Amino acid sequence: MPKLITILLVVACAVAVGIVSVYLFWWAVSRYKVLTARERPVRASRAAIWRDPGEVERLDFRAGPGGPEGAPVPPFRFVEEHATGSNPSLSVRDARGRVWRVKWGDEVKSETFATRLAWAAGYFVEVAYYVDEGEIEGAIDLGRASSCVGEDCRFREARFEMDEAGVRKLFDEHGWSWDDNPFTGTRELNGLKVVVMLLANWDNKDVRDVARGSNTAIFEHRLADGTIEARYLIIDWGATLGKWGIPGTRAKWDCEGYRSQNDSFVRGVKDGVVSWGYTGQRTDEATAGITVEDVRWLYRYLGRVTDRQLREGLLASGASEEEAGCFTAAIRQRLDTLKLICQRGEI
């Protein structure tokens, strides 16, 4: 028995050393990429991370930020396949000449819905739609995507994300970090962190994690008056609506797992600061320093989202009737927890 315990301890130490070594390697590569990146300075005259969403209870969760008129229109024509990313993806051009990035895999439904809820809270997102089935003309001799597009060029269950024309996009080493941006300490940034935790988005990597793929970016938009606005946003909401946690325990699009963590969504409130149960890629940056007043400000918008909107958004994102019912109830429970904080200042 003592020999077995010794062996187990040695194995555990070896695994721990291996994990630490991998993370140190990723950190070093990310640091190198950021330091050696060719400068792409932000050209905007102002920065934004949030805008007033208006009458939240009237927003169309089925169509999302792009609206019904913004949906992809067939026929779709193959443009190129992408080798990056954890899931198969390619670009297509639709009947209106717009380019879409098409993705398959376990993030399709969660990402499509998560962008709708973040949008309803006032945050910038990329326009995304769920397309149940279709055909991509010219999609032959594919690599990874060959498992998602048949020999007849037909596909099922895809997320179409618009590649918006005229927008200058700063990705990866040119993005932003949770602890270094123009909004540090503001209610707008803290509100975004709450949305991340509300949706159980455990993959909140930023520019410091560029070796593994940063999920933050800056999009420069030219406004009607000619002003260039730099919009700070999260560009990957796929790792949501499941369980947060350490590697090996996380999940995506898993209602039972998502619901099982509702009781630990908020741990408590002390001296006006909220304590959270969330664990993700950047746990400390997501959870620290969020006050009751931050939650009250955010709930002015999120609190107006109706169950009907949640359900319609989920169904439009590919959820089954059962999944839509489960997620609607589970999300409402978390929103009710935020409401309780707003009312009592405690939990």
Residue positions per predicted region:
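Short polybasic/polar patches that bind polyanions
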Residues: 119, 200, 315
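Regulatory N- and C-terminal appendages and interdomain linkers associated
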Residues: 2-78, 94, 307-347
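Conserved ATP-binding subdomain of kinase catalytic cores across diverse folds
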Residues: 66-175
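C-terminal catalytic region of ATP-dependent kinase domains
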Residues: 221-347
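Extracytoplasmic/periplasmic, Sec-exported soluble proteins
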Residues: 84, 106-110, 183-190, 286-290, ...
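Conserved kinase catalytic-core segment
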Residues: 108-111, 116, 171-248
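Short linear motifs in intrinsically disordered
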Residues: 2, 71-84, 265-269, 301
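Extracytoplasmic/secreted envelope proteins and their assembly/folding machinery
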Residues: 89, 111, 115, 192-195, ...
